[in-house]
């Protein structure tokens, strides 16, 4: 099944149909990952933003998180990346259920399997982190989420966890542009020097 055809999560599917009525020009469908399949860096976020990827159909575009993330990536000259989300549909109240997260896991696995040169996965937020841990058969009870954690998933692949670059995290001071930049500088160092 293609991600655009997925209707597995009835709550999300109905929510997107309601949003399409309210915002007829918006994408309002599941959002697939974006970027080059030859990328060595994959960024995994939570889910499409209402006025971001839910509008454009491209992860991390057109909203606060996307603008901040892409500005930082441009600033450090990290232009070759693949970007996706743990949950492919905009979740009501920005809170996907456990079942909705599980339903999207197979799409994440398929995307990651296509990235043959992948060296680093950067997760933005705990939900994305837990999904990647699960995809690689690790336990989130053993590998607890912590900002800046670096975990070797296998001989070729490293996971770096980060807080999400959400407006809430930035405005409350939990996270900063500098912290985000530092995460991606670590990713670039791993790609360039192992």
Language-model regions, residue ranges each:
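A polyanion-binding, active-site-adjacent surface
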Residues: 1-153, 157-193
């Amino acid at each position: 099944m293609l991600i655009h055809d997925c209707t597995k999560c009835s709550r999300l599917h109905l929510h997107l149909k309601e949003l399409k009525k309210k915002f007829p020009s918006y994408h309002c469908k599941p959002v697939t990952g974006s970027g080059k399949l030859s990328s060595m860096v994959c960024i995994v976020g939570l889910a499409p933003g209402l006025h971001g990827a839910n509008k454009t159909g491209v992860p991390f575009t057109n909203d606060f998180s996307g603008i901040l993330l892409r500005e930082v990536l441009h600033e450090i000259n990290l232009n070759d990346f693949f970007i996706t989300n743990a949950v492919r549909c905009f979740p009501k109240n920005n809170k996907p259920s456990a079942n909705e997260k599980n339903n999207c896991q197979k799409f994440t696995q398929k995307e990651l399997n296509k990235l043959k040169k992948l060296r680093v996965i950067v997760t933005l937020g705990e939900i994305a982190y837990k999904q990647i841990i699960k995809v690689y058969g690790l336990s989130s009870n053993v590998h607890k989420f912590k900002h800046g954690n670096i975990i070797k998933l296998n001989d070729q692949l490293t996971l770096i966890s980060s807080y999400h670059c959400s407006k809430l995290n930035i405005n409350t001071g939990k996270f900063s542009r500098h912290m985000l930049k530092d995460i991606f500088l670590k990713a670039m160092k791993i790609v360039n020097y192992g």
